[in-house]
Amino acid sequence: MPKHILIFDSGIGGLSVYKEIKYQLPLAKYIYAFDNAAFPYGELTESVLIERTTHIISELCSQFPIDIVVIACNTASTVVLPSLRDKLDIPVVGVVPAIKPAALVSNKIGLLATPATVKRSYTYDLIKSFAPISDVQLLGSTRLVEMAEEKMIGIDVDMRAKRDLSPWQNKVDTIVLGCTHFPFLKNEIKKALGNKILLIDSGEAIARRVKQLLNGDGVESAVLFEGEVFCSAPSIKEEALNHTFKELNFSSLQCLGYPKF
């Protein structure tokens, strides 16, 4: 039997984390779930975030022999991890903005995240702990999250991304990608702010942690398993989404039927 890894996000940005884990554990069985009914998570209250993530993840854990859960969403990770860890008897891994590695290489840092992440005390505690003498500028953008989703189904977002990032022109030299959607906008960010800008995300570190918790054993056979993907509500972009997921070795989109309200 393969190890079953559940990756969860509000949208499809968590696929950036999936790619890193898949590289480390290519033969595991992957279940990807995203809560598109409540996308984007950056605009939800903490209580709603906890309720939705707990419900969806618990349902999938009852359907599959999940070995580990990865919350591939910075916004959710700052809120839901304690509740999930109390409820589940398997490891739950979250995403932390990569402030610490950024502070090791620069003192002109930009943290690009959702509005919710940049407002939370958790984020300021990270900065205080790991970058106390650095100039850390915060930019919270729901629009960039939406652009990443659009790009992943083939829509061009170059010029819009440049406008949203213009406040950082010549002000930062290192950017922490504090949302799992943003690795998909690396080219657009470099076009907007210059190719010399250093972009840092947490994907590789998460993959190493998952591998460690699974004792380095992603699978017990040499079979390549097709992943399964679930959304919380029907999507008008289903055809484009299925194309994206098929390229990443997932089956067709399945709907859990969990509306926003």
Curated annotation (Swiss-Prot):
Keywords (alphabetical) are: Cell shape, Cell wall biogenesis/degradation, Isomerase, Peptidoglycan synthesis
The family database entries (Pfam families) matched by this protein are listed as: Asp_Glu_race
Active site (catalytic residues):
73 (proton donor/acceptor), 179 (proton donor/acceptor)
Among InterPro entries, the record links this protein to: Asp/Glu/hydantoin_racemase, Asp/Glu_race, Asp/Glu_racemase_AS_1, Asp/Glu_racemase_AS_2, Glu_race
Q: What is its EC number?
A: 5.1.1.3
What gene does the UniProt entry assign to this protein?
A: murI
What highest taxon heads this organism's lineage? Bacteria
Has UniProt tagged this entry with the keyword Cell wall biogenesis/degradation?
Answer: yes
A molecular-function term among this protein's GO annotations: glutamate racemase activity
PROSITE patterns (alphabetical): ASP_GLU_RACEMASE_1, ASP_GLU_RACEMASE_2
Pathway given in the UniProt record:
Cell wall biogenesis; peptidoglycan biosynthesis
The UniProt entry, under HAMAP family, shows: Glu_racemase
Which reaction does this enzyme catalyse, per its entry? L-glutamate = D-glutamate
Q: What name does the UniProt record give this protein?
A: Glutamate racemase
Functional note: Provides the (R)-glutamate required for cell wall biosynthesis.
Top class in the EC scheme: isomerase
